[in-house]
C-alpha cells in the first residue's frame, strides 16, 4: 500500500506543477526588523480564500463555521490576549482568482498565515508562491495527498482533513470485506481532486478481485452529469463510486434513480452532506448510500446531547446566525479553526516558523471530531494531521456509523 502511495504522489506532483507555476512571484512578504507581519501583542491576522460564488459555493459555510469559532475564542479573550482577525476572500473556485487573493492577503493585508484555503487546484496554484514567501499555508481545505507528502519542497503547507488516498483506501477495504468481487463504475471530477481519489482507489484495489470497469469524468463548468451517468449505468458495474462535489453529487443520485440503476453507491465524503446533497436529491433516493466520516454530524440525533455539538450550535447561532447549524461544512470549518487555535497556543514565540513547528508537532483532541480520531503530527516530515475515518451508511433520515474507526498508514 505504501509503494502504491509513493507512485501516485509522484504522478500527482507532476500534475500540479503546471498549476503552481502561475502562482510564482519574487515579492518578499517578510516584515521589517526581523518581525513577522500579521501578529502583534493584541492581534493575529489570518487569511483565507473560498468559493463564495461559482460551482462550489456550497462550501462557503466552511468559512462561516471557522469565523464562528474564531469569534467565540475572541469573546473569551483571544489566544494569549490576541484577537483573531480572519480575512476571507472569494475565488469562485478558480485558481487564477486564488492566486490574486493569496497575493493580496500576503502583500496588502499582511496576514500572519493563510488558513484553510479551499480547493486542490487553487492551493496547487499558490503553494510555490506562498512557500517562497515563507508564509504558513496551513490546514488547507482539500484532501489531496500531496499536502502531507511534499514537506521538503513546501514546508509551510499542510493539510488537515484525511487525504483522498486515505479515503480511497477505506472504500477499498470496505469493498474487499463486503463485496470482494465488485465491478466498479466511477464518476469523477476532472481535476487534481478527482484524479487523486480515483488513482488512490485503483492503487488500493491492486491485488484484490475488485475491478474498475467504467470511468466517466466531468468538468466543474458542466451543467449536469446526465450523459456521464447514462454511460456508467450501461456498464456491467454492480458498484458506483461517486467522486464529486455537492452539486454534482446530488445530480448523480437523482440520475441513478431516474435510470433505475440499483447498485451499491459509494459517495465521497465531500459530497455526503444530508443538507446540501441528499435532501436536494431526495432522501428516498439516498437510502443505502455508503460514505465516510471523521467529524460529528450536526444533523444526527446521535449527537443531540453531545457537549461539543451543543457548543458548536450555540456558537454558530451567536456569531454566524446566517449559517445553518445542520450543515456539516460548518462543523468542518469550526473544527479546523479549533485546530488552528491549538496550533497558535502551541507557538513558543510569535513567529511564522514557530507556528509551523507547533503545527508539525501536535497531539490534541478536537471535541467535534468523532471519538477515537485525533489531530496528531510528529515532526517536520509529518504532514497528515488526521489519519482516520469511519464508514457510514445512510438509513432513514440520517447517516449511521458502521464498524470501528479505520486508521491509515503513511
Each language-model region and where it sits:
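C-terminal motif of bacterial Sec signal peptides marking the signal peptidase cleavage site
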Residues: 18-21
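Beta-alpha junction/loop-to-helix N-cap segments that form part of ligand/metal-binding clefts
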Residues: 26-34, 58-64, 76-149, 160, ...
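Extracytoplasmic "Venus flytrap"
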Residues: 32-40, 44-67, 89-96, 118-119, ...
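Signal peptide-proximal N-terminal region
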Residues: 41-46, 64-86, 206-209
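Extracellular/periplasmic periplasmic-binding protein-like sensory domains
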Residues: 256-332, 405-408
Amino acid at each position: 500500500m505504501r509503494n502504491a502511495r509513493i507512485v501516485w504522489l509522484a504522478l500527482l506532483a507532476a500534475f500540479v506543477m503546471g498549476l503552481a507555476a502561475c502562482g510564482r512571484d519574487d515579492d518578499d512578504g517578510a516584515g521589517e526588523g526581523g518581525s513577522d507581519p500579521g501578529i502583534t501583542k493584541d492581534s493575529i491576522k489570518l487569511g483565507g480564500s473560498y468559493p463564495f460564488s461559482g460551482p462550489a459555493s456550497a462550501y462557503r459555510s466552511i468559512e462561516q463555521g471557522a469565523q464562528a469559532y474564531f469569534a467565540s475564542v475572541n469573546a473569551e479573550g483571544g489566544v494569549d490576549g490576541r484577537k483573531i482577525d480572519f480575512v476571507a476572500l472569494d475565488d469562485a473556485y478558480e485558481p487564477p482568482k486564488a492566486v490574486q487573493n493569496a497575493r493580496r492577503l500576503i502583500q496588502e493585508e499582511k496576514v500572519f498565515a493563510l488558513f484553510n484555503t479551499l480547493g486542490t487546484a487553487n492551493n496547487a496554484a499558490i503553494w510555490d508562491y506562498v512557500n517562497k514567501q515563507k508564509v504558513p499555508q496551513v490546514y488547507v481545505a482539500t484532501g489531496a495527498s500531496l499536502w502531507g507528502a511534499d514537506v521538503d519542497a513546501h514546508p509551510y503547507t499542510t493539510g488537515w482533513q484525511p487525504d483522498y488516498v486515505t479515503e480511497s483506501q477505506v472504500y477499498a477495504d470496505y469493498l474487499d470485506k463486503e463485496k470482494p468481487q465488485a465491478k466498479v463504475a466511477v464518476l469523477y471530477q476532472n481535476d487534481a481532486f478527482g484524479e487523486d481519489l480515483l488513482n488512490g482507489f485503483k492503487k488500493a484495489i491492486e491485488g484484490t478481485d475488485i475491478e474498475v470497469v467504467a470511468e466517466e469524468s466531468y468538468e466543474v463548468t458542466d451543467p449536469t452529469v446526465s450523459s456521464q451517468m447514462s454511460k456508467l449505468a450501461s456498464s456491467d458495474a454492480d458498484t458506483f463510486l461517486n467522486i464529486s462535489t455537492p452539486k454534482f453529487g446530488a445530480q448523480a443520485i437523482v440520475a441513478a434513480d431516474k435510470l433505475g440503476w440499483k447498485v451499491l453507491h459509494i459517495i465521497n465524503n465531500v459530497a455526503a452532506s444530508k443538507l446540501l446533497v441528499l435532501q436536494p436529491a431526495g432522501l428516498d433516493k439516498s437510502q443505502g448510500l455508503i460514505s465516510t466520516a471523521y467529524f460529528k454530524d450536526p444533523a444526527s440525533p446521535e449527537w443531540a446531547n453531545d457537549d461539543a455539538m451543543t457548543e458548536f450550535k450555540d456558537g454558530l447561532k451567536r456569531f454566524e446566525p446566517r449559517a445553518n447549524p445542520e450543515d456539516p461544512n460548518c462543523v468542518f470549518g469550526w473544527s479546523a479553526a479549533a485546530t488552528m487555535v491549538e496550533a497558535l497556543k502551541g507557538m513558543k514565540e510569535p513567529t511564522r516558523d514557530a507556528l509551523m513547528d507547533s503545527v508539525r508537532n501536535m497531539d490534541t483532541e478536537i471535541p467535534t471530531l468523532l471519538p477515537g480520531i485525533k489531530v496528531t503530527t510528529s515532526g517536520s516530515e509529518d504532514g497528515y494531521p488526521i489519519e482516520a475515518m469511519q464508514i457510514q451508511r445512510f438509513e432513514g433520515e440520517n447517516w449511521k456509523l458502521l464498524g470501528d474507526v479505520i486508521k491509515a498508514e503513511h
